[in-house]
UniProtKB/Swiss-Prot annotation:
This is 7SK snRNA methylphosphate capping enzyme. Its EC number is 2.1.1.-. S-adenosyl-L-methionine-dependent methyltransferase that adds a methylphosphate cap at the 5'-end of 7SK snRNA (7SK RNA), leading to stabilize it. Also has a non-enzymatic function as part of the 7SK RNP complex: the 7SK RNP complex sequesters the positive transcription elongation factor b (P-TEFb) in a large inactive 7SK RNP complex preventing RNA polymerase II phosphorylation and subsequent transcriptional elongation. The 7SK RNP complex also promotes snRNA gene transcription by RNA polymerase II via interaction with the little elongation complex (LEC). GO terms for molecular function: 7SK snRNA binding; RNA 5'-gamma-phosphate methyltransferase activity; RNA methyltransferase activity; S-adenosylmethionine-dependent methyltransferase activity. It holds the Pfam family Methyltransf_31. The gene is Mepce. The modification Phosphothreonine is found at T188, T268. The lineage of its organism: Eukaryota, Metazoa, Chordata, Craniata, Vertebrata. Dephosphorylated at Ser-126 by the PNUTS-PP1 complex, promoting RNA polymerase II transcription pause-release. Residues 1-141, 235-291, 309-383 are annotated as: Disordered. There is a cross-link at K620 (Glycyl lysine isopeptide (Lys-Gly) (interchain with G-Cter in SUMO2)).
Length: 666
């Protein structure tokens, strides 16, 4: 045995490394017994061991597993049994001790991943300290570990469209070299790809004035632009209307057809004879029924407060006339206009086809020229009764409804010397704010306000109390500071007005109406110098214009031309201009504020008459100045006064001044 061991000594398994420290504190690992190894050990050490010596494996000692012993007999070539897996030994697999195992050693900076089933870690996001003398951090078993060295590296881009590299993907460095830049930009689509072409056409807005592209210096409501590409017609959304709505619409259809026809009686009869009696009856009706345009609805102001009509106005029989009956009546009203933007519940599904057919004709008629004549069918949906109410532009506080608490900015462009001691006629005075302001501030000899709507005239007469109360309040403040009221002790005696709730005065108007002017009172002092009359200034025939006699020094025509133009067409507007010229005395002036043509289309669907006249208009507002100075009318000259800086751009309209010669030609 000794000889055999000596001969086979070079083939023995090398001795295991010295055992590591028992970090886990467990028992010994599995023991392996080998007779050949024991014999060779005796030759080296020279000591005698008993039969069956045991050799402890280094791996078992290091692991501390305390597993079962494995004995190998008759192993070929004297080799001992292979120890268990190194990973299993280090984890302490197969041992009976349940102590925490030692962490594995990192190899070349790589931490091997533990399978989720081994080791029995604690809950997530917790720090685990190994048992025994040496404490170490243990990563959670079921949490993915971040790799230090990734197995698969990310593929960096190598092909750049602009010819750059990873450090210069846009190839900006090529711009430093002019030759390279010129070569790259020789073919534009390659160096800078063109954007994808969209489905919708690009709308190019070309301004009318290239020096003012934003139309900041113009006074029109809308900038006149020309579209190089056609507009895209959007689809309108219509709410679903059930059968209940259709039944209700059919039930109310018969009543609306009869209620839409207005009476054909004259709006205002003549001022003498039977007309005076009829006018008194109308005044009584206005006192009884509440008026929607009244500023003070709780106080019934007597019409006798207003001074009587001047004799010059009573003497002229043809100064006031009624509008033609054809322009007052209109088509039956069944539903709202198709051009209205708001959703209305007064149109049923059966009208969808008619609405679509009329919309196309209206769009084509918007840009119709003056010299062309086309056939424009009427809207199939009809006109509403509410629209007939305001067909003459007789909105309450038409000019100042957007800024009711502010002063009329048109007063800033007017000059007081135009009105002092003059006879003034204000056409389309509405509720009379501008008329009363001029009569109160600048002292005209006579101020006549004329409007076609009797309800607006009724409100204008009631507004006299407000202006008179304001004047009385200012006079009271002035008298308080008068030095002539000093007493015996040298102190100023101030007579304070009785305290009264300001809210009642603001909501209910003045406490008392102004006094009725006595006989012989000065008629040139406010409020005796102002009077409001209901009537239509547009005459029926040209023969009546020739019979007009001069009566006034100043005629005001603010924001009126559009409504005369739409209701009576070119003939009615020309007739009104000629009558204004004949109504002025030699040396008189006309203050004109026309509306722009762009604002006409917004009101073309009010009535059937307006819709027809809109497409027949040939005399545009830009041609008013040339027409008024032509021999057909007779004004000698005109000038642009200014454009009031109104807060609303739609009311920023130019104000013109037309002069009548001292010796008129006719």
């Amino acid at each position: 045995m000794i000889e055999m061991a000596a001969e086979k000594e070079p083939f023995l398994v090398p001795a295991p490394p010295p055992p590591l420290k028992d970090e886990s504190g467990g028992g010994g690992g599995p023991e392996v017994q080998s007779h050949q190894e024991a014999a060779s050990g005796e030759l080296r050490d020279g000591t005698e061991h008993g039969p069956g010596p045991r050799a402890h494996s280094a791996g078992a000692a290091a692991s501390g597993g305390g597993g079962p012993q494995a004995q190998a007999h008759g192993e070929p070539h004297g080799r001992a049994a292979a120890p268990a897996d190194v990973g299993e030994e280090r984890r302490g697999g197969g041992g009976t001790d349940l102590g925490p195992p030692a962490p594995p050693r990192p190899r070349n900076g790589y931490q091997p991943h533990r399978p989720p089933g081994g080791g029995g870690g604690k809950r997530r996001n917790s720090c685990n300290v190994g048992g025994g003398s040496g404490g170490s951090f243990k990563h959670p078993a079921f949490k993915r570990r971040r790799r230090v060295n990734s197995d698969c590296d990310s593929v960096l881009p190598s092909n750049f469209l602009l010819g750059g590299n990873i450090f210069d993907p846009l190839n900006l460095n090529s711009l430093l070299d002019e030759e390279v830049s010129r070569a790259l930009n020789a073919e534009t689509p390659k160096s800078s790809p063109l954007p994808a072409k969209g489905r919708d056409p690009v709308e190019i807005l070309i301004p009318k004035d290239i020096t003012d592209p934003l139309s900041l210096n113009t006074c029109t409501d809308e900038a006149h632009v020309v579209l190089a590409s056609p507009l895209k017609i959007g689809r309108k959304r219509h709410r679903h209307r059930g059968p209940h709505h259709q039944q209700q619409q059919q039930a109310s259809g018969g009543n609306d057809s009869n209620a839409a026809v207005l009476p054909t009686d004259p709006l205002t009869p003549s001022l003498h004879g039977e007309g005076a009696t009829q006018q008194q009856q109308n005044r009584g009706q206005n006192r009884d029924a509440p008026q929607p345009y009244e500023l003070n609805t709780a106080i019934n102001c007597r019409d006798e407060v207003v001074s009587p009509l001047p004799s010059a106005l009573q003497g002229s029989s043809g100064s006031l006339s009624a509008p033609p009956a054809a322009s007052v009546t209109s088509a039956p009203s069944t539903s709202s206009s198709s051009r209205h933007r708001k959703r209305r519940r007064t149109s049923s599904k059966s009208e969808a086809g008619a609405r679509g057919g009329s919309q196309g004709s209206k769009e084509k008629g918007r840009g119709s020229g003056g010299g062309r004549h086309h056939h424009h069918p009427l809207p199939a949906t009809g006109f509403k009764k509410q629209q007939l109410k305001f067909q003459y532009g007789n909105y309450c506080k038409y000019y100042g409804y957007r800024n009711p608490s502010c002063e009329d900015v048109r007063l800033r462009v007017l000059k007081p010397e135009w009105f002092q001691g003059r006879d003034v006629l204000d056409l389309g005075c509405n509720v009379g704010h501008l008329t009363l302001s001029i009569a109160c501030k600048w002292g005209p000899a006579r101020m006549v306000g004329l409007d076609i709507d009797p309800r607006l005239i009724h409100s204008a007469r009631q507004n006299i109390r407000h202006y008179l109360s304001e004047e009385l309040r200012l006079q009271a403040q002035t008298s308080e500071g008068d030095p002539g009221t000093e007493g015996e002790e040298g102190t100023i005696t101030v007579r304070k007005r009785s305290c009264f709730p300001a809210s009642l005065t603001a909501s209910r108007g003045p406490i008392a109406a102004p006094q009725v002017p006595l006989d012989g009172a000065d008629t040139s002092v406010f409020p005796n110098n102002v009077v409001f009359v209901t009537g239509n200034y547009v005459l029926d025939r040209d023969e009546l214009v020739d019979a007009q006699r001069p009566e006034y020094d100043v005629v005001l025509c603010f924001s009126l031309t559009k409504w005369v133009h739409l209701n009576w067409g070119d003939e009615g507007l020309k007739r009104m201009f000629r009558r204004i010229y004949r109504h002025l005395r030699p040396g008189g002036i006309l203050v004109l504020e026309p509306q722009p043509w762009s604002s006409y289309c917004k009101r073309k669907s009010l009535t059937e008459t307006i819709y027809k006249n809109y497409f027949r208009i040939q005399l545009k507002p830009e041609q008013f100045s040339s027409y008024l100075t032509s021999p057909e009318v007779g004004f000698s000259s005109y000038e642009l006064v200014a454009t009031p800086n109104n807060t609303s751009r739609g009311f920023q309209r130019p104000v013109y001044l037309f002069h009548k010669a001292r010796s008129p030609s006719h």
